[in-house]
């Protein structure tokens, strides 16, 4: 059973939003306070978003479908790949190609081309063609692999999509909404939560925060066959919470590792 504590969220800097001037007004309901012109997110609502997302993911997996992990920004790319691979799920971590969902059949043709080139490389075909042809095919394979490796084994549309930074991944969101694919996303203070089915209010820039959220989704997938849920431990009262926020703010943890103060 996954155990999430308020303290673990604080330690990851989940509660730090962007500068006050960058607020999307639709995020106001998720704001707890502000410190030094930085918005502080309401971790009670973050915990609820985690719980809702965890339950949605488990329903999707039990229905025999997959969750597509999406995060192409620098802070998220490696984490997205690691956690998607850990839970044996498809992922996009380099660039979202228009039509990955809405023009899925065409994308599958490109995937089949990639698989064919990979097969040619190992079945001896390359031994029978010129070096120039090999070079051309390798360039084509590398180009395809860069954007399609993570979805090579995604034979059908996913049952849900998990996104880091919905502002950056707007095309993916538009395609998922068009196809009525449920969207789970970490929503920072500069995001629009209304286009997300399961918004998780949180810092989508700091590496530790991104890693924590992505691991939670991966854990939900791995535990879907164990009939276990998620345990939320609210181990800080409001006074302690404010003290922790002040301490973290003083240490400037929000801007560590590509944090959120901009």
From Swiss-Prot:
GO terms for molecular function: structural constituent of ribosome. Signal peptide: none annotated. It comes from the Bacteria. GO terms for biological process: translation. Keywords: Ribonucleoprotein, Ribosomal protein. GO terms for cellular component: cytosolic small ribosomal subunit. Pfam families: Ribosomal_S2. Transmembrane segments: none annotated. Belongs to the universal ribosomal protein uS2 family. This is Small ribosomal subunit protein uS2. It comes from Borreliella burgdorferi (strain ZS7) (Borrelia burgdorferi). The lineage of its organism: Bacteria, Pseudomonadati, Spirochaetota, Spirochaetia, Spirochaetales.
